[in-house]
Amino acid sequence: MAKLGYKVEADPSKTAKAMGRTLRISKKHALEICREINGMKLETAVSFLNRVLALETPVPFKVHNKDVPHRKGKIGTHAGRFPQKATEEILKVLDNAKKNAEYKGLNTEKLRIKHISSNKGFIIKRFMPRAFGRASPKYQETIHIQVILEEFY
């Protein structure tokens, strides 16, 4: 497996990093969630994602919004969804980054998301048996998520 580095260079004394690899979530959902929470304070982002899990606040879909229904409320755009599986996985990666910050001695109340991105992972190839001895391919795409938290003053 190839070594996967971070896209952004950061000062190690003020930042904490975490990465989630080969997550079985939708790449479109991961892109929209990462775009929405990038630059937020960590506590604000976690509370936003918890509201998404509770089906209270939708994630605005600005890029992949074809056939996405409108949602009421002020979300910045009309189209939005509640991506449950991707939200849970991104919350786990954010929790790991917060624990890394605690280990490094950073103030966890003053952390903001400096960088978060989703990258395409490898494809898990499987086959579904069909009639008359044939088989159809069944592909499962995976996603890598990388997070850099920065302490602000």
UniProtKB/Swiss-Prot annotation:
It comes from the Archaea. The gene is rpl22. SUPFAM superfamilies: Ribosomal protein L22. InterPro entries: Ribosomal_uL22, Ribosomal_uL22_CS, Ribosomal_uL22_euk/arc, Ribosomal_uL22_sf. This protein binds specifically to 23S rRNA. It makes multiple contacts with different domains of the 23S rRNA in the assembled 50S subunit and ribosome. HAMAP family: Ribosomal_uL22_A (MF_01331_A). It comes from Methanococcus vannielii (strain ATCC 35089 / DSM 1224 / JCM 13029 / OCM 148 / SB). The keyword rRNA processing does not apply. Belongs to the universal ribosomal protein uL22 family. GO terms for biological process: cytoplasmic translation. GO terms for molecular function: rRNA binding; structural constituent of ribosome. This is Large ribosomal subunit protein uL22. NCBIfam families: PRK04223.1, uL22_arch_euk. GO terms for cellular component: cytosolic large ribosomal subunit. The keyword RNA-binding applies. Keywords: Ribonucleoprotein, Ribosomal protein, RNA-binding, rRNA-binding. Part of the 50S ribosomal subunit. Disulfide bonds: none annotated.
